[in-house]
UniProtKB/Swiss-Prot annotation:
UniProt source species: Gallus gallus (Chicken)
Pfam families from the UniProt entry: PAN2_N, RNase_T, UCH_1
Protein name, UniProt field: PAN2-PAN3 deadenylation complex catalytic subunit PAN2
Reaction equation(s) it catalyzes: Exonucleolytic cleavage of poly(A) to 5'-AMP
EC annotation from Swiss-Prot or TrEMBL: 3.1.13.4
Length: 1197
């Protein structure tokens, strides 16, 4: 350890501290010292440095082994042997650090730590290296990357650090305190006051911390409290160095003589058992550094600044014969260190050189060192020679250049055939010795090949939907995962990257440039996000569910309406369907159908999402049909207005989707049975012909045979009184307004059918655009292709990409004849009905949505939707009148071309659901939304808890005369419990990455009056009953205890989440302003979208940009002289405190005479918080800075 305060080469230190050393020896002040010295900055000694080429080392004796240069002419300030790897670290006065590997001192890394200050101490860790400068502690990797950078006050002057354990560090200097830093959080955890300032050296034993002071004293401090236990006054001048071993403490330093300092040649030795000085040790050199080198004996290495080195026993006499001299380039030794193995010594001099001494040529710095990572060597640009005639030479010897163009290997497998190499000729020796028996020949092994040498073939992976090979345009990563790079980036599964700030610094605008709202995917069973968006953009469905409200706690119609309301309010910010999915998980039918997924199944991709979303589509339509068909009156919610849709018992879902069908069963005995039913969707049925090639079908043909289905099956015949082969046919009696089609592509057979039909449609489209006669089954010749692209022939070249993989039309025409026969044909968006067509019996359907399954083996696949957004929604959301197709991939929303919505590359993009809506659908329905939530939701209601009593009530409900108006203030606070712990992983560099955040559920919501005679009195204090398992009640922070949310044993006012949610929705709709602390998180967990002008968040009112957020507890203590949140949190207390803070904010911001007065108040707040480490002091330690509450106490309950 170097006491740098005595080195005259440092200009900022007073030279009077060490007058014995002449300042002319400083190379900074006297450049003539460097005139005859010439050094290579890479560490190779040149002329002028006398370094022996071969060193003879006697075993057991230290001799110079190697010398290297850190930086020419810049004095070395500190050296340190790495405690984990075979490296020596050197820092200099220019703030530059260099590491050398092994006993040969090969330069490993070199980088700048500080641009202005010198490096004063180095400490190696497992994950990096700590560098201490005057006002800065920096941790860097061994390669030079910054891990963290801890800045201290400019008034600090740090000199020493001590690693007390793997994660705690003490830092001291010339000031009167020592700082304790937690290396895990990189935060100051404690500050110890020092009676005698100027700690420049620190050591540690199993009993004490040892601190060396500039005054010449050594203090022994308690390991836990840092309190001084003993103190030794070693020297009258100053302390230079000391070391501790066992029960001995040895010091060297300077004594005051004739108004100056002189180096004392007596080493002071102290016995730590008796805590007193023993016989001092006299040496023959001026000691400046000393270290114990305990091997067989407790030897001391004593170094002078002029380069003399003496070894002696601390209890014996120093022998002049044991003095050695370091061959320094500069005149002064600036630093000294001993390796952990005690086999190597390191000296740094004033000319930037480091000298390694060792007791053997094969020296190791540590007893057990881990392997050091080296940089990969540079790849030589010359390409290897490849002999084409050699069969076993791999072609991969020559790397393929990176290119974005299509390679020859990208040619589709359907247009090429494998051409294997010809078999190698048979060895002539085998032919010469071969004997034949009939047509079989055999010969002895000539032993010219290695054993078991066979051609290696890669295992071919079969993909269910991949009948021909495709590879991406770029060759990067082809072998690793080709399917990943086939999927366009916008179709890949999107994930939220969580940081320390959660979602605050995640840029959702990067994924969504529109004003439409996406949906977050991290919630369990959020695979249905794309279908929620499809239903939302069906205007009649959206208006229906937003007008619907009933008394059922878990009603999907109600929750869907509340979610749609948030999507209406959002201006591009994503929403989350947590409440809807919470209700969805409670429905028994959903669980019975296998629609509730476990987290493991959803994450690993074990579920066929295409089949799952089709089942979910059938379930949600049926569920909405049942829920909206229920009678009003007893089932209507007490705060709901009347619906604008239809009469009692009528379902708009039935009007939109329901189709009455007639099922006829004909037994071979001649008995016919007819049964009438209704269906909400149809499933495509594909022909089961085994003919090759597959016939050419239009989509309308397949759709007709799927609707009017005919099949042979075994059924019970009442006439025959047994199961008989029966022909079952299905016919429809009416057409729906919205035609929903499940594509049912669940195997390679259906995928091949789609692919083949798309190829037929591709050829028809090309011939139609090129003016050729369309003939089914005719292939286009090469000459026809050339004519299609030849402008002289008169044909316009069609966009091939727009025609690929398209089979389904953008519109279809359906007609029901008088005989109830169905006609279906493909139609065009631009085509209109002829005058002869009856609008009542002829329907034109336009494609409005497609849901596709994205196949991706790495992420488990995902579901996305293409939705055609109409003029009505565009006008309301963006103020424009047009139609546009959009891709909805959770929170990624992007406009796409209409052709892309119907293009299905079956190798990665598989169709799942199609929605066709009748043209001019919106004109048939009343699309007026009447808010069904009325003021009666705020009136008193009964508690679900059986043990709750009126005397325990913590709130007074609003009276009709107190109903809030627009602009009224309401104090709000919410408490939460944890349903699922967060999922995180530790990366190889030690950092923590959050994969999935913890799932929170609201447990208590409190609203207090913000004005009037009862200001501060709560009118809502609801505990939310939950049926889900709670893993952590967070009692310390929420005040919620086990049993508070259980209706059987709770004594609280317990309600359902839906009931309290409707109260908050009513307050939002009225226009009240919510005042609270951290409301952004509260509204997010409650799943509410609140306009920004209705939110007053005190966490932002008292905040300076780019500074930390301040807790409610500290703000209440500082401004209001209130002590809150003692043992637990109370939401009533927090809501009241937030209101008082807002009043205080208005007083400070509007009452000041200068506009900068409030900013001065905030600066004073942050300064006070920094001094107190943002902890509210105890009552007996420090009084609050303010006195008196902002307004009188609120009415007690």
């Amino acid at each position: 350890m170097n006491f740098e305060g005595l080195d005259p080469s440092l200009a900022e230190y007073a030279p009077t501290l060490h007058p014995a050393l002449d300042p002319v020896l400083d190379p900074h002040l006297n450049p003539s010292l460097l005139q005859n010295v010439e050094l290579d900055p890479e560490g190779v000694p040149l002329e002028g440095i006398a370094v022996p080429e071969s060193v003879h080392i006697v075993e057991g004796m230290y001799s110079e082994l190697h010398t290297a240069v850190s930086e020419v002419g810049v004095p070395v300030s500190v050296s340190h042997f790495d405690l984990h790897e075979e490296m020596l670290w050197v820092g200099n006065h220019g703030g530059h650090a260099t590491s050398f590997f092994g006993p040969t001192l090969e330069r490993y890394s070199s980088f700048q730590v500080n641009s202005s200050d010198d490096i004063r101490q180095i400490q190696s860790l497992e994950s990096g290296v700590l560098f201490l400068t005057k006002t800065n502690l920096k941790c860097m990797s061994r390669g030079g990357l910054i891990i963290f950078d801890y800045l201290m006050d400019e008034a600090e002057d740090m000199h020493s650090l001590l690693l007390t354990d793997s994660s705690t560090l003490l830092v001291g200097g010339l000031q009167n305190h020592v700082i304790e830093i937690d290396l895990n959080t990189v935060q100051e955890t404690q500050k110890y006051t020092v009676e005698v300032p100027g700690i420049t050296i620190m050591r540690q034993s199993n009993r004490f911390f040892f601190c060396g002071h500039t005054s010449g004293k050594v203090s022994l401090r308690d390991l836990r409290t840092f309190v001084v236990e003993h103190e030794f006054d070693a020297y009258s001048g100053s302390l230079s160095d000391f070391d501790v071993h066992g029960n001995l403490l040895v010091t060297c330093g300077f004594s005051s003589r004739m108004n100056g300092l002189a180096c004392d040649r007596f080493l002071k030795v102290y016995d730590l058992r008796m805590m007193r000085a023993t016989t001092p040790l006299q040496v023959h050199i001026d000691p400046f550094f000393l270290r114990f080198i305990p091997t067989y004996t407790s030897r001391l290495a004593i170094i002078s600044q002029t380069g003399q080195c003496q070894f002696c026993e601390p209890t014996g006499l120093a022998n002049p014969a044991d003095i050695f001299h370091v061959n320094t380039v500069g005149p002064l030794i600036m630093t000294f260190d001993v390796s952990a193995s005690k086999q190597a010594l390191a000296f740094g001099d004033s000319e930037g050189c480091v000298h390694l001494w060792a007791d053997s040529p094969e020296v190791t710095f540590n007893t057990y060192s881990r392997e050091t990572d080296f940089a990969l060597p540079c790849i030589v640009d010359t390409l290897p020679h490849l002999d084409w005639n050699q069969d076993l030479v791999p072609l991969s010897l020559i790397p393929v250049p990176l290119t974005s163009e299509t390679l020859l290997s990208d040619w589709p497998a359907a247009n090429s055939a494998p051409a294997p190499r010809r078999a190698p000729p048979v060895d002539p020796e085998i032919l010469r010795t071969m004997k034949k028996v009939g047509f079989i020949g055999y010969a002895p092994n000539p032993r010219t090949k290695l054993r078991n040498q066979i051609p290696y073939r890669l295992k071919e992976a079969d993909n269910e939907f991949d009948s021909f090979s495709q590879v991406p345009e770029s060759p990067i990563g082809r072998e690793e995962e080709p399917h990943l790079y086939m999927v366009a980036k916008k179709y890949r599964k999107v994930t939220i990257k969580y940081s320390k700030l959660g979602l605050e610094d995640f840029d959702f605008k990067h994924y969504n440039k529109t004003l439409f709202a996406g949906l977050e995917p991290h919630i369990p069973n959020a695979y249905c996000n794309c279908m929620i968006q499809v239903l939302y953009f069906l205007e009649p469905v959206r208006c229906l569910v937003q007008n619907h409200l009933c008394q059922k706690e878990f009603c999907l119609g109600c929750e869907l309406g509340l979610l749609f309301h948030m999507l209406d309010l959002s201006r591009g910010d994503p929403c989350q369907g947590s409440n809807f999915l919470r209700a969805f998980r409670t429905i028994p039918e959903a669980s019975a159908l296998g629609l509730i997924l476990a987290d493991s199944d959803e994450a690993t991709g074990k579920v066929n999402l295409g089949r799952l979303i089709q089942s979910w589509n059938r379930f949600i339509l049926t569920q909405l049909h049942q829920e909206t068909q229920e009678q009003e009156g007893p089932q209507a919610y007490r705060g709901a207005g009347s619906s604008t849709f239809g009469s009692s018992g009528d379902s708009v879902i039935g009007q939109l989707f329901s189709c009455e069908v007639e099922n006829c069963s004909m037994c071979r005995c001649g008995k016919e049975t007819v049964r009438v039913s209704s269906t909400l969707l149809f499933t495509l049925s594909y022909p089961e012909s085994a003919e090759k090639p597959v016939k050419d079908y239009e989509f309308a043909q397949i759709l007709k045979r799927s609707i009017c289905l005919e099949q042979n099956t075994q059924a019970w015949c009442e006439n025959c009184e047994k199961y008989q082969p029966t022909v079952q046919t299905r016919n429809i009696r009416c057409l729906p307004d919205v035609l929903v089609i499940n594509c049912e592509v669940n195997s390679s057979k259906e995928a091949d059918f789609w692919k083949t039909q798309a190829e037929y449609a591709f050829q028809r489209a090309l011939m139609k655009r090129g003016g050729f006669e369309i003939t089914k089954g005719k292939e286009i010749s090469l000459g026809d292709w050339k004519e299609l692209g030849n402008p002289e022939v008169g044909h316009s070249y069609p966009s091939v990409e727009e025609l690929k993989n398209i089979w389904i039309p953008h519109a279809i025409k359906m007609r029901l004849t008088k005989n109830k026969e169905l006609d279906v044909c493909n139609w065009s968006e631009s085509d209109e009905l002829s005058p002869n067509d009856d609008p009542e019996s002829v329907y034109v359907y336009d494609l409005m949505a497609t849901v596709v399954h994205i196949l991706d083996s790495r992420t488990g696949g995902s579901l996305v939707g293409h939705i055609k957004v109409g003029e009505t929604y565009h006008q309301r959301k963006e103020g424009v009148t047009h139609q546009q197709w959009y891709l909805f991939n959770d929170f990624l929303i992007e406009p796409v071309d209409k052709c892309e919505a119907v293009q299905f590359d079956m190798s990665w993009k598989v169709p799942a659901i199609l929605y066709y809506a009748r043209r001019n659908l919106n004109s048939k329905y009343n699309l007026v939304i009447k808010n069904p939530i009325e003021a009666s939701v705020l009136l008193a209601e009964a508690s679900l808890a059986r043990k709750q009593r009126k005397c325990h009530a913590t709130f007074i409900p609003l009276m009709l005369s107190e109903m809030p108006q627009a602009g009224d203030l309401v104090g709000l606070d919410a408490e939460f419990v944890t349903l699922n712990e967060e999922e995180a992983e530790l990366r190889s560099d030690g950092t923590k990455s959050t994969i999935k955040p913890s799932q929170m559920s609201v447990a208590r919501i409190t609203c207090v009056r913000g004005q009037g005679p009862n200001e501060g009195v709560p009118f809502i204090d609801d505990y939310i009953s939950t049926q889900e398992q709670v893993v952590d009640y967070l009692t310390q922070y929420s005040g919620i205890k086990p049993g508070d949310l259980d209706a059987k044993i709770s004594s609280k006012h317990l309600t359902t989440l839906k009931s309290t949610y409707l109260k908050l929705r009513f307050l939002i709709d009225v226009g009240v302003k919510f005042v609270g602390h951290g409301l952004q998180k509260d509204f997010r967990v409650i799943n509410l979208m609140v306009p920004k002008d209705q939110v007053i968040d005190t966490v932002y009112l008292f905040h300076i940009p780019r500074k930390r957020m301040i807790s409610l507890r500290f703000l209440a203590w500082y401004f209001l002289d209130l002590k809150i949140q003692g043992e637990t949190h109370d939401s009533i207390e927090d809501a009241r405190t937030a209101l008082q803070l807002y009043r205080k904010y208005l007083e400070l911001s509007q009452g000041g005479s200068e506009p900068d007065d409030f900013r001065k108040v905030l600066k004073a707040l942050y300064e006070k918080g920094r001094k107190l480490d943002w902890k509210v002091p105890e009552p007996d330690s420090q009084s609050s800075p303010k006195h008196g509450a902002v307004f009188p106490p609120v009415l007690a309950l």
